[in-house]
Amino acid sequence: NFKGAPTVYENDKDITVFKLLNFQNASKVFLSGNFNDWSTGQTPMQKTDSGWVAEVKLKPGKYFYKFIIDGQWMQDINNNLRESDGHNNYNSTYYHYNYNFKLEGLTDKKNIILAGSFNNWNEKELKMQKTATGWVLPMFLKDGTHTYKFIADGEWIFSNPAGWYG
């Protein structure tokens, strides 16, 4: 979802890090989003050698945000996840995950796709990430009961028959 390295991620202390690359000539940069009621001054970003950074403690969920660079609003151009802001522009979107799907083994496979009730059984959307021992995919799931299966190189395979409850 990001062009290059992620510009929003969770650090090892479960703090969400927002990065704005470049703009070193800016004098003030703020982070604004639904997590701070779209405040224009509550979350200042700190200047670094590669741009600007802010750390925010977020609960799992879906978040919208923009940067305010010397008074000018701007979406995160390095984040491909975005939704209309209702004013003919876009908000950048970030999901703080609450679940990590894991599938052990099958390391000989080229692709594993996760499909389930949470994405209308879409067979292409959720590509899992290969690890040394299997496959993983962190996600944000709404509370409720979810059923799912895996697709290994185009072939439907087993899943946890009990599904996931949260």
Report the location of each language-model feature.
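Aromatic-rich carbohydrate-binding modules that target alpha-glucans
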Residues: 9-60, 72-143, 151-166
